[in-house]
């Protein structure tokens, strides 16, 4: 279930970022920061 939740959240975030028309590099950097923060909260 955790993976399903992560997948849904990631897809939702990607859709939101598309609204801001960010470049691929900016999107990747944003997602990387988000994942690192999420992993820190999980630990």
UniProtKB/Swiss-Prot annotation:
Q: Which domain of life is it from?
A: Eukaryota
List where in the cell it is found. Cytoplasm; Secreted
Q: Domain EF-hand spans what residues?
A: 1-20, 22-43
What are the recorded GO MF terms, alphabetically?
metal ion binding
Q: Does the keyword Ligase apply?
A: no
Keywords of this entry = Calcium, Cytoplasm, Metal-binding, Repeat, Secreted
Q: Any stretches that span the bilayer, and where are they?
A: none
Where do the annotations place Ca(2+) 2 binding? Answer: 37
Q: In which tissues is it expressed?
A: Detected in muscle and cutaneous mucus. In the skin, detected in cells in the basal region of the glandular epithelium of the dermal mucus glands (at protein level).
Residue pairs linked by disulfide bridges in the UniProt entry: none
Q: What does this protein do?
A: In muscle, parvalbumin is thought to be involved in relaxation after contraction. It binds two calcium ions.
Q: Give the similarity note.
A: Belongs to the parvalbumin family.
What is the name attached to this protein's record?
Parvalbumin beta
Q: Which organism is it from?
A: Rana temporaria (European common frog)
Q: What is the lineage of its organism?
A: Eukaryota, Metazoa, Chordata, Craniata, Vertebrata
